[in-house]
UniProtKB/Swiss-Prot annotation:
EC numbers for this chain: 3.2.2.28
Function: Excises ethenocytosine and uracil, which can arise by alkylation or deamination of cytosine, respectively, from the corresponding mispairs with guanine in ds-DNA. It is capable of hydrolyzing the carbon-nitrogen bond between the sugar-phosphate backbone of the DNA and the mispaired base. The complementary strand guanine functions in substrate recognition. Required for DNA damage lesion repair in stationary-phase cells.
Record carries keyword Secreted: no
Organism, scientific name: Escherichia coli O157:H7
Top-rank taxon, per record: Bacteria
HAMAP family reported for this sequence: MUG (MF_01956)
GO biological process: base-excision repair, AP site formation
Record protein name field: G/U mismatch-specific DNA glycosylase
Gene: mug
Length: 168
């Protein structure tokens, strides 16, 4: 089981779709060696060095958190049903209402659209929010994603810089 890493007052909560088998096996988020999450958040400016999956709790030192839409681990995210994503979206809203981070970063357009019953999502900040929490849609850093490392870092850096501008 991969536990959420959440606390009140975070700058951002990164929300993956669901744990992969590597994460489920280790108990650490984004644990597969091909997953670029840890490299991307470092290069985008969220951390001052590249954390390892087993150091995930240190995200809180940077006022960052991690959660997921669906708890069930799978090999690929496309094994998750629309119903599971929609139910996960409802639970995610409750978590975000409880913790009230400055931003929620959903990692993947399909996850956002199905989890929040939205259509035609674009990358970046969304018009939808949860209270005062901004919702952002960022490319998924999975090794299965075709998005280049450069584009991932650019998208994540945009969020980091927007939070700095807000004084957070």
């Amino acid at each position: 089981m991969v536990e959420d890493i959440l606390a009140p007052g975070l700058r951002v909560v990164f929300c993956g779709i669901n744990p992969g088998l590597s994460s489920a096996g280790t108990g650490f988020p984004f644990a597969h060696p091909a997953n670029r999450f840890w490299k991307v958040i470092y290069q985008a400016g969220f951390t001052d060095h590249q954390l390892k999956p087993q150091e995930a709790q240190h995200l809180l030192d940077y006022r960052c958190g991690v959660t997921k839409l669906v708890d069930r681990p799978t090999v690929q995210a496309n094994e998750i049903s629309k119903q599971e994503l929609h139910a996960g979206g409802r639970k995610l809203i409750e978590k975000i209402e409880d913790y009230q981070p400055q931003a929620l970063a959903i990692l993947g357009k399909q996850a956002y659209e199905q989890g929040f019953s939205q259509r035609g999502a674009q990358w970046g900040k969304q018009t939808l929010s949860i209270g005062s929490t901004q919702i952002w849609v960022l490319p998924n850093p999975s090794g299965l994603s075709r998005v280049s490392l450069e584009k991932l870092v650019e998208a994540y850096r945009e969020l980091d810089q927007a939070l700095v501008v807000r004084g957070r």
